UniProtKB/Swiss-Prot annotation:
The chain crosses the membrane at residues 7-29. It is found in: Membrane. It comes from Gallus gallus (Chicken). Its EC number is 2.4.2.42. Residues 39-64 are annotated as: Disordered. It is an enzyme of class 2 (transferase). Belongs to the glycosyltransferase 8 family. One of its GO terms (molecular function) is UDP-xylosyltransferase activity. Coiled coil: none annotated. It catalyses: 3-O-(beta-D-glucosyl)-L-seryl-[EGF-like domain protein] + UDP-alpha-D-xylose = 3-O-[alpha-D-xylosyl-(1->3)-beta-D-glucosyl]-L-seryl-[EGF-like domain protein] + UDP + H(+). This is Glucoside xylosyltransferase 1. Residues 30-433 are lumenal. It is a single-pass type II membrane protein.
Amino acid sequence: MRRFARVALLFLGCGVCSLLYGVSQLALSLEQEAGGARQRQARESAAPGGGRQAGSADGGEEGAGRCKNLSVSFWNSYWMLPSDVCGVNCFWEAAFRYTYMETQPSETMHLAVVACGERLEETITMLRSAIIFSIKPLHFHIFAEDQLHESFKDILDDFPYEGKVNYTLYPITFPSEGAKEWKKLFKPCASQRLFLPLILKDVDSLLYVDTDILFLRPVDDIWSFLRKFDSTQIAAMAPEHEEPRIGWYNRFARHPYYGVTGINSGVMLMNMTRIRRKYFKNDMTSVRLRWAEILMPLLKKYKLNITWGDQDLLNIMFFHNPESLYVFPCQWNYRPDHCIYGSNCKEAEEEGIFILHGNRGVYHDDKQPTFRAVYEAIKNYSFGDDLVRSLLQPLELELQKTVHTYCGRVYEVFIKQLKKSIKDLSVRRSKGS
């Protein structure tokens, strides 16, 4: 019995000693923190501006960079972060917890397009449609073959919106590994879009569109979806089909795809900062891979099974990472498939088409005259002319000639939003904004 009592006393003594040691260390850390705070305050009061932002800890650039770096190698065990890492209380907190880690859409809207071959006129028409109704400044990132650069420059320099619109021309470039395969994937240069997060390293958010896109409402409105992303979402696209019975992926695909009918990448809104940071789940390795690491392995594994090139690769990625995709309604990427088999985009029927996507070359043949009429109307519109007399009224007359087609039977959806956009623009101009 005495032996047990001695053991109990020994444990009790050890416990008391541990408690005293913990209290002394806590008191010491509080004293050091108070002293450090006084020293920092003295330094900051002597510096211009006097204050500092969260994340600019005393560790200088190294400390600030360490605080913002998402690699787990920067954080010690149990997420107990050293006091010199962050300019906030990081105790028991993870790197993702603080708002300064979140990126906010910038005031300027960034729009990217890739143009190869005979796509100059189509691209210019798309850019014109983006300019007509948009409110915030636009910066166009145009990736084009070298022989197209001079033509783009001559046309864009004549646009009458100096100050509101800027542009940058880029050559078509692919990674040295597999450059030939990337260039010929699906259509010439189409896969360039996959490398935009790696090329435009200083651009936080970006709207990528195909050349055959027409904006029927301000770019600002689709840009605002960035603020609707939850903490896991990195991109937004529309479904490939609304009706599974006419879907391509669910009937013919030989690879994984997102959701029920897949996604269409002709209109792709991206938070590129998040894309560059994310580690993607995949079916090639148990290790998650970053964007730059996953593209080539995906192509090597699936190149014999994909039909639509880079769009198929994006479907595979988001099949494994569905939580990272925001899906917007079909009216933001309205294609011939939404009307040639009968109207199957309810949102467009109710509110009109927001973004028209004339894939399959429908702007340049007579197979879908409804789509071609919208394209020709915007192409022929002169900046500064009255939008009702020079754009809307001629377009409505042309659309009425297409009622013999399935899409022409619902031609009202092609001008419903356009009418509203013109009215809203007129109100803004009357208010001087």
